[in-house]
Amino acid sequence: MVHIISKKSVSFIGQSLAAKIDEQLFSKYGFKVEQLMELAGLASAQAIAAHYPKSKVAVLCGPGNNGGDGFVCARHLQQFGFNPSIVYPKESKNELMKSLVIQCETSSIPVQPNLPTDLQSFPLIVDALFGFSFKPPAREPFTEILKAVRASGIHVFSIDIPSGWDVENGAPSEASEDIIHPHAVISLTLPKMCMKSWTGPHFLGGRFVPRGLVEEHGLQMPVYPGFEQIVKVED
């Protein structure tokens, strides 16, 4: 059972503050990208395992840090008994991303550029295409994938930001075909402004934020019970 917290008990942050927090974590507080990616991916996998039965899962990964979270999530999902396949439509030249690909491929997790031809046999899709630095609209090769996912009707779990959404304002339009309309979301570090009106299942992971950073920005952080890495946010 995931501990539940009130939406009123945590801060919702915009794009600029989210970027500032990341910048300070990597500079002033000495964190490495791969550290936070591992924590984010693990928290995402834990939320998925808490909310969905073990199954095949297609993990959509973009070329940036959100995609890296997806690779880590897939690796942990396999450890939790799921059967992940990764869709990686645009490869990154970043050495960290190359390492994440190797980690998954050597763990027998398929990595391919296109959606599986048997997509309808997957009960769950994990959306890790775009993070909080995304600015709409989406472009190829992502638009066709987003449209296909939307048309599939398969349950989608988004990591941090549903792909195609404006970080401040949320989904551009309910009628838009090239954005993700998820069934559940995990916010990372803190929820972004676009999640304020979200009423579906909403998890939060980010039990690593230094106290000094919290105090500097006047942030309301969740209280994580025991040694848990995730909480569930409700009204």
UniProtKB/Swiss-Prot annotation:
Which molecular-function annotations from GO does this UniProt entry contain?
metal ion binding; NAD(P)HX epimerase activity; nucleotide binding
- UniProt protein name: NAD(P)H-hydrate epimerase
What EC number(s) does its UniProt record assign?
A: 5.1.99.6
Q: Which domain of life is it from?
A: Eukaryota
Q: Which residues bind K(+)?
A: 66, 127, 163
Q: Which residues form the YjeF N-terminal domain?
A: 18-221
Matches recorded under InterPro entries = YjeF_N_dom, YjeF_N_dom_sf, YJEFN_prot_NAXE-like
> What cofactor does this one take?
K(+)
Sites binding (6S)-NADPHX sit at 65-69, 131-137, 160
- Family (UniProt): Belongs to the NnrE/AIBP family.
The record's annotation in HAMAP family points to: NADHX_epimerase
Reactions catalysed, semicolon-separated, are: (6R)-NADHX = (6S)-NADHX; (6R)-NADPHX = (6S)-NADPHX
Q: Which PANTHER family match?
A: NAD(P)H-HYDRATE EPIMERASE
Name any one Pfam family assigned in the record.
YjeF_N
| Keyword line | Isomerase, Metal-binding, NAD, NADP, Nucleotide-binding, Potassium
**Can you supply one Gene Ontology CC term for this chain's record?**
mitochondrion
What does the UniProt cofactor note say?
Binds 1 potassium ion per subunit.
Per the entry, what this protein does is: Catalyzes the epimerization of the S- and R-forms of NAD(P)HX, a damaged form of NAD(P)H that is a result of enzymatic or heat-dependent hydration. This is a prerequisite for the S-specific NAD(P)H-hydrate dehydratase to allow the repair of both epimers of NAD(P)HX.
